[in-house]
Amino acid sequence: MELRDLERIEEFRQVVELERQIWGVDYDDVVTVPILTVTVKRGGVLIGAFDNDRMIAFVSSLPGIKDGKPIQWSHMLGVLEEYRSAGLGRALKLEQRRRSMKIGCDLVEWTYDPMQAANAHLNFVKLGVVVEEYAINVYGESTSRLHKGTPTDRFVAQWWIREPHVARRVESKSAVVIRTPEAARPIGSLSKAAFQAA
């Protein structure tokens, strides 16, 4: 397995094909080769995961400005179905974090479907995101087989990539961090009583 920056038109075409395979979207809803090209040339992050020479996953973010400071807007993280639940999404996000820090960003944001439990687990447990915004039907009608016919309501995830709580999350082997007045303490599992106390 290899993770690497994507820089060539042929690789961008593979990303477009992965978008169609992963989400089942029409060409109306894909991020196109010209947009991926500009993204890479103007400060975005585009990383692919390869199994031998086959691209099996990718993460893409666009440069942006929020409150006068540079951020990355992570628009897509996609993994082919047969490669899911093996830590590949997390590995891609950690690479995205490294590159975002290198170019001077403190914040990476993205939206995710609150009905997708696996995404919530990755975002909160593995990465340490916070959510302060719920966006109503943010993308309008989608051609995706996953979202077709439903509103595209989303949480807006904020990933403060230099913050200590994020460093603890991405370096932790535990499942959950519970914040207490004294300090944050990692635990291996979360009982119902502990969850209610949190």
Regions from the language model: what does each represent?
Residues 111, 121, 128-145:
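Conserved catalytic-core motifs of GNAT/GCN5-like acyltransferases
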Residues 187-198:
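A conserved acidic, glycine/proline-rich C-terminal tail/linker
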Residues 83, 87-95:
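Conserved acetyl-CoA pyrophosphate-binding loop and the N-cap/start of the following alpha-helix
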Residues 100-113:
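Conserved GNAT acetyl-CoA-binding A-motif
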Residues 70-81, 174-189:
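Conserved acetyl-CoA binding element of GNAT-fold acetyltransferases
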Residues 1-81, 135:
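A conserved beta-strand-loop-helix scaffold within acyl/acetyltransferase catalytic domains
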Residues 137-170:
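C-terminal "cap" of GNAT-fold acetyltransferases
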